[in-house]
Amino acid sequence: MSYNVIVPTTVLPPWLRIGQNWIFARHRRTEVGVVLPANTKFRVRADFAKWGITRPVIVRLLNNNRNTEREINLTNDQWIEMEHEHECVPFVDWPVGEKNTMAEVHFEIDGPHIPLPVYVFNTRPVENFKSEYRQSSSGYCFLYLDLVCILVPPASKNVLLDTDLFELHQFYNEIINYYDDLCGLVEDPYADTVDSNLPNKAAFVKADGGGPGGAYYGAFWTAPASTNLGEYLRVSPTNWMVIHELGHAYDFVFTVNTRLIEIWNNSFCDRIQYTWMNKTKRQQLARIYENQRPQKEAAIQALIDNNVPFDNWDFFEKLSIFAWLYNPQRGLDTLRNINHSYRLHAARNPVTPYPQIWAWLMSCGYDNFWLYFNRIGLYPADFYINEHNKVVHFNLHMRALALGQSVRYPIKYIITDFDLLQKNYDIKQYLESNFDLVIPEELRQTDLVADVRVVCVIDDPSQIIGEPFSLYDGNERVFESTVATDGNMYLVGVGPGVYTLRAPRGKDKRYKLHLAHSPNEPVHPANDHMYLLVTYPYYNQTLTYTRYITSDLAIDAAHLFGTDRLYVATIYFDALQQTVTVYLNNIRTGRENNTTLYFEMEIHNPFIGTSSKFTLLEDNVTMRQGYYKFPAVTFSSIRLHIRDDNRLMLVDKYLPAGDTLLFMFPNQIVDNNIFPDGSILTSTYNRIKEQAAFIENHKQLLYIENELRDSIYLASQFVNSDSNEFLKYFPDYFRDPHTFSYLFRFRGLGDFMLLELQIVPILNLASVRVGNHHNGPHSYFNTTYLSVEVRDTSGGVVFSYSRLGNEPMTHEHHKFEVFKDYTIHLFIQEPGQRLQLIVNKTLDTALPNSQNIYARLTATQLVVGEQSIIISDDNDFVPPPPRVNCGDQQIRVVETLKMIAF
């Protein structure tokens, strides 16, 4: 008898590659519709000419054991004669990776064979199908349940007949839809964006008596290692086997050399149990707790107290860390964002290396998790490789500061006597663990407040006394004051939680700031990033100021990558401090359990003849992430050994495999083959530019005193103390003398504000506020009464606004960027007191008494006067004659993060 099977191809979105197994990409196949008894003879061929398909077509003879199955690769139109010694169900795989085509396979079967009972969800009554299956001599049947297809083996026939197929359909579809949502995948029949899901996908489920372990997720199906389906037919929120194996379809690259195998997918499983279960069931039945939450929390607390490396924790201890990470309101945004970021990386050609996992999570979080990670011994990397294949700084703390992220921390470390059952302070929000992460805003309901003193230790108190400081929970300022005359900060009426302290950083002296507990009260997690933990009961804190003289941007660094180019470590060569510091972010550089030497650094002191070594194997199970610091006196030799090419980058050049010898000189490390004399100036200058670009992308940092601006200032002085190229990014103390704020104020009858144009040239910022005047600026005039026009260096209109005297004005607020040699034309029908210029809050009485006012920006100032003033010495652009009626144009209006100055 003849059978023809026509199957579509599986279209891959741009982030998936042929041969990858994620999200069931190779699970789709179509049944021939028969069960072949053992030793049945048949012929099979594919029709390549008809459809123009170019990839091999695969026919599979499936049953309930991989050892008795067979795969047939069809590569041409020729018939293939087959005889298989085991009972089997033939299927045709959907070819993967081709668009707009089909595959057609012809079967000619000799001898008896059995029709395969097939059920397609919701296309016919379930009982009709079950009756057919019950009466059939076939032990097999095949189910199409939308997002899952199930080949039921003979050993599961009776169970299947007693199973509610609607519940089974809902169970599988709810899991896969939820996992897709956690990844931010979008249904898209064209599959042409980085967020596109796989069209027409479905997981394939079968039994496999020859499979590994208890069950597995594979390239072509997921299966229990049994001749029956077992748990795969049990509908229950506690069915960990099924939700676990389906979760493996979403591992992507997050388990590659991260020691998160069986953890990443479990975090998906835990999330769906979190969704399915009520509060009581969550504590009693969820796999993460199993009615033993206090004991499990105590075990994790012991791991933290004993500084056990996180990489050595067991599966479910690691899983808990992810559960608490995702529990907060916006916690799952972190998961969606990191999956979107993965797809962006994967869609590039060639694919750029993926960031270190903990830094990656930090960069994708809605909140700040650094202190939480640090508490459990996780160290996010400082650097990553961007889309231009360039190593750049994450600036995680600066990013968090710019975005106003709240700092989440376990509640048990904030309210130290908190217990979910015994003393929960009647907190109304849902918490499931004493380790749940909270922010100060969520603890306000406890009514716990106290006065906390921050003791400032500084060599010159005059640098900070009387200077303002403030305390923030995200973007909310919860307290502000000035440093007292005794040099301390007094926080009055502050509630528990982790805040970001915006402390003064000095005046003409710059400092590194280190925040820690008071010596006799060791409860505060010390850090250099101004994360201030206010606990209950309350303790005083110590803020130590250390002179900051040589910029961190003037310190050369090496970047170590693993065999798969995942980030492993940063090596800082600090010539001033005469140290070499290895910041280890990944204890695995290659294959698991492999003890082959991968990297070695040896520092030799030429004066006393001693040496220090730092060694990394492919897998380093006894090591922990963090900092390893070694002395390196001036003229020390430093031998760097790397096993492979293109895996160790020094400054911006990859070192060859083998040994490289460096020397620690007074200002830099030196190797004649790499660094010409004075190269530290060039590399420092390049790092300044990179960090300035970062601030440009996070403009809020221009208004907040921070260490990055200190670093740019000190590095600029090191490179060229006479240059003001980076003045815009200097600390306020050095920038303020060059900061001019110009406010043009249009005034109407009764001195009402009609329109204000404010410009701060050094910050490249402009703001326009329009008042609300229903009768217009001056109802006696039916011609243009006022206008504002800003043009760029090529004459293009950046902003334009005008009103007739009797034309209504409604409230508007615009913010946009302006740069050197931009020009401004203002028109006022009644010159004089109707248009004022206020410079740095002082009225400028020299403004020309003219209807038309012109201005041109320099790097730091605004030159105001007649029309000729807009012609720059180094710019021959002459604008067209002024148009009094400018119209309402708003072209290239740039919205910055926030402009506190306005």
UniProtKB/Swiss-Prot annotation:
Involved in disruption of the peritrophic membrane and fusion of nucleocapsids with midgut cells. Glycans are attached at N73, N265, N278, N339, N540, N593, N594, N620, N782, N840. The keyword Glycoprotein applies. It comes from Heliothis armigera granulosis virus. The keyword Repeat does not apply. Keywords: Glycoprotein, Late protein. Residues 27-330 form the Peptidase M60 domain. InterPro entries: Mucin-bd, Peptidase_M60_dom. This is Viral-enhancing factor. The lineage of its organism: Viruses, Viruses incertae sedis, Naldaviricetes, Lefavirales, Baculoviridae.
